[in-house]
């Protein structure tokens, strides 16, 4: 299964058919980060059944005193599942169809990406790039789980700029020829999912050729004429940016201890991920809103006005068609607009203010929530929210190519329940 491409086939592990899918799969660890009740309910749903919930550390628990013990339990579960639970394997890709709440079907290919073809360093131009700024302080807690882990299970979703639908969609057109691996409902409103094994050599070659064409200099120059001659971009990280960065950091750490020959084949060099086509109608790019906690809405508004007056032309009430957003608190909600803003995107200007505000209010805490009803619920509990305008997905790749990265947590793909659920696993320890 050797390939020179940055995304290739893998030895993918799955649980035995006796394990219920609705208990095995759980949502990405970086969802519901302010909602412990969600994760407590997930724990109740799983009970004593094997589940990927036991292989991850939900971020809601990252700062708890027992986080280290949780990591130990995760590693122990990985060893147990390697022996007794993950009894099926695919040598290739898994073609996935996820039916979203809207009824649209999101198609994807699960395979491994080469971490040598990826970097989150500022200014780097590898074939695989983050879509948003990577906050290095967020990497170590994720490294603690991956370091020493026997297995990985992915919630990383990669995006291909494939307007001709050459990579993922042709596999879906022939799914009747493939062996179905799983199908069923996902827990807690996750919807329906099905997966098929892609192991046929001709199909593997087809995927490799399509990917090579997408990542060619000729295709890159045609798609982005303003960046003609620059290093081509093949895949961008859609979801799971910091988890992928942690995998890269762990690989660099391990690589330093390996011989050149060992570096060529060690399983930790790769990371399992799902690749989707950004042009799919089922891919929705939604803004991620900001919510401040332990603050007073009136104080935030006064500070915002003062900061805007000092750093730009000010702020006005109503939509001025420049950078409009909604500031919402427990009892108030106002549309505001930055005048002569300091950043190209509304999210960038809002982030600059939040950074300024939090530097002066040590009690303040910020969370990033992409579901507007969830944001409104948090404001009723005392949070102060910055609700951001829609983000056009057509600008995503152009923004990465021309600007390097977008501001941190600019966008999200779908609602929280529609995020990738952990199902497939891969061994990363020799």
Segments from the language model and where they lie:
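N-terminal extension/subdomain marker
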Residues: 1-190, 195-199, 219-224, 391-406, ...
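Structural beta-strand/beta-sheet cores of well-ordered domains, especially the beta-sheet scaffolds
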Residues: 51-53, 154-156, 233, 268-274, ...
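Short, contiguous, pocket-lining structural segments
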Residues: 150, 199-202, 206, 235-242
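A residue-level signal for conserved active-site and pocket-lining positions in enzyme catalytic cores
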Residues: 158, 240, 378-379, 423
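Short beta-strand segments
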Residues: 159, 237-238, 274, 387-389
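Active-site beta-strand/loop microenvironment that shapes enzyme catalytic pockets
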Residues: 213-258, 263
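Catalytic or ion-translocation cores adjacent to nucleophile or general acid/base/metal-coordination motifs
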Residues: 241-305
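C-terminal catalytic or substrate-handling cores of phosphate/nucleotide-
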Residues: 292-410
């Amino acid at each position: 299964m050797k390939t020179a491409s940055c995304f290739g086939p893998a030895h993918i592990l799955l649980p035995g058919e006796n394990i219920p899918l609705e208990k095995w799969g759980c949502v990405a660890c970086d969802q519901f980060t302010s909602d412990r009740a969600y994760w407590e309910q997930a724990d109740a749903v799983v009970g004593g059944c094997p589940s990927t919930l036991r292989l991850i550390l939900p971020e809601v628990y990252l700062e708890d005193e027992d986080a280290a013990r949780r990591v130990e339990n995760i590693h122990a579960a990985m060893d147990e599942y390697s022996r007794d639970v993950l009894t099926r394997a695919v040598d290739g890709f898994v073609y996935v169809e996820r039916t979203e709440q809207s009824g649209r079907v999101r198609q994807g290919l699960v395979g491994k990406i080469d971490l040598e073809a990826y970097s989150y360093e500022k200014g780097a131009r590898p074939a695989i790039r983050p879509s948003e700024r990577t906050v290095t302080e967020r990497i170590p807690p994720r490294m603690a789980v991956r370091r020493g882990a026997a297995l990985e299970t992915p919630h990383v979703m990669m995006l291909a700029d494939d307007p001709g639908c050459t990579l993922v969609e042709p596999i879906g057109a022939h799914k009747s020829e493939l062996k179905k691996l799983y199908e069923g409902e996902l827990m807690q409103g996750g919807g329906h999912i099905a997966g098929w094994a892609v192991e046929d050599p001709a199909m593997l070659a087809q995927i490799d050729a399509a990917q090579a064409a997408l990542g060619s200099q000729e295709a890159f120059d045609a798609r982005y004429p303003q960046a003609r001659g620059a290093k081509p971009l093949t895949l961008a990280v859609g979801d799971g940016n910091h988890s992928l960065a942690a995998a890269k950091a762990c690989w660099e750490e391990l690589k330093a201890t390996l011989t050149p020959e060992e570096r060529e084949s060690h399983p930790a060099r790769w990371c399992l991920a799902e690749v989707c086509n950004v042009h799919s109608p089922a891919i929705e790019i939604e803004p991620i809103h900001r919510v401040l906690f332990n603050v007073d809405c009136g104080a935030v508004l006064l500070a915002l006005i003062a900061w805007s007056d000092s750093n730009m032309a000010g702020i006005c009430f109503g939509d001025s068609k420049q950078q409009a957003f909604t500031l919402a608190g427990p009892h108030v909600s106002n549309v505001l607009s930055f005048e002569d803003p300091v950043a190209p995107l509304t999210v960038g200007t809002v982030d600059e203010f939040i950074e300024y505000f939090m530097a002066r209010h040590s009690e303040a805490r910020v969370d990033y929530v992409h579901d507007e009803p969830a944001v409104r619920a948090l404001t009723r509990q005392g949070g102060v929210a910055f609700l951001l305008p829609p983000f056009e997905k057509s600008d995503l790749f152009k923004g990465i190519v021309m600007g390097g990265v977008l501001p941190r947590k600019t966008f999200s793909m779908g609602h929280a329940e529609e995020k990738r659920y952990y199902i497939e696993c891969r061994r990363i320890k020799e």
